């Protein structure tokens, strides 16, 4: 009812549009980084996709943008970074998954922290930032921790 439009993070056209926009910005301006804050899926918008499908869509976008930035950096001798500011909790431990590891010892199933708050792996952002760091798709992460140490759900 507000007239706002929401871009679908799973759409290849949307992903390409955002990647192209970021790359055009980097071509025109001497920027140090592309940084995303409050991004991807939003709350209150119904969808038929599972959490895994949404994470795969977001992964696809982040990898596309990362690959484009890395290619530009190599070609032009630049050092532009890609960063993300997710919520301060990756995933809470209140779920029934056990951690598993690949042949190199890298974690392949997500684990969480001893917290009880909004977590960006699940909830509505569906962002596997640990995967992005492990695969070097992002250069830095700046978690949004807008609470004090006395917060009982996440006392850090």
Regions of interest found by a model, annotated:
Residues 1-24, 28, 105, 120-124:
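Active-site-adjacent "subsite" loops/lids of carbohydrate-active enzymes
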Residues 1-8, 40-56, 60:
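Aromatic- and acidic-residue-enriched carbohydrate-binding clefts of CAZyme catalytic domains
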Residues 5, 112-113:
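General secondary-structure edge motif
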Residues 17-50, 139-144:
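Active-site groove signature of glycoside hydrolases
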Residues 48-106, 110, 116-156:
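Glycoside hydrolase catalytic-domain groove-lining segments
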